[in-house]
UniProtKB/Swiss-Prot annotation:
Quaternary context: Homotetramer.
Protein name: Nucleoside diphosphate kinase
Transmembrane segments: none
Enzyme class per UniProt: transferase
GN (gene name): ndk
Free-text function comment from the UniProt entry: Major role in the synthesis of nucleoside triphosphates other than ATP. The ATP gamma phosphate is transferred to the NDP beta phosphate via a ping-pong mechanism, using a phosphorylated active-site intermediate.
Keyword Nucleus: no
Domain of life: Bacteria
UniProt organism field: Aquifex aeolicus (strain VF5)
CDD domains associated with the record: NDPk_I
Length: 142
């Protein structure tokens, strides 16, 4: 297994629930190092750019509106096989499904449904690279 970096974003619904500390602690307990951390609020334009891969999907506008509805926290996590492991820890996209098949996952614990699912995580090395560079400058990553 190789050491990788991946990006997570704690979404507005989880921020509103006060789940940030518990979510970050989960990744620390799983052995990840936090290499960068930033709180901000997406503008609708920047949210649209970030989620450009979904621009043709019917949920795109709703996603953009949700992601720009409140503060988020982005973090670069580093660890062995980080992309795959983080995706396993966060659970299925739909929080209702996650409660059935991965009840200890972050989305099961803090998400509501498929749209308000608490957390984003990169799904491939290519998306991790794009997303990390989109959110952070090189000087912000240790």
């Amino acid at each position: 297994m190789a050491v990788e970096r991946t990006l997570i974003i704690v979404k507005p619904d989880a921020m509103e629930k006060g789940a940030l500390g518990k979510i970050l602690d989960r990744f620390i307990q799983e052995g990840f190092q936090i290499k960068a951390l930033k709180m901000f609020r997406f503008t609708p334009e920047k949210a649209g750019e970030f989620y450009y891969v979904h621009r043709e999907r019917p949920f795109f506008q709703e996603l953009v509106e949700f992601m720009s509805s409140g503060p988020v926290v982005a973090a670069v996590l580093e660890g062995e096989d980080a992309i795959k492991r983080v995706r396993e820890i966060i659970g299925p996209t739909d929080s209702e499904e996650a409660r059935k098949v991965a009840p200890n996952s972050i989305r099961a614990q803090f998400g509501t449904d498929k749209g308000k699912n608490a957390i984003h995580a990169s799904d491939s090395p290519e998306s991790a690279q794009y997303e990390i560079c989109f959110i952070f400058s090189g000087l912000e990553i240790v």
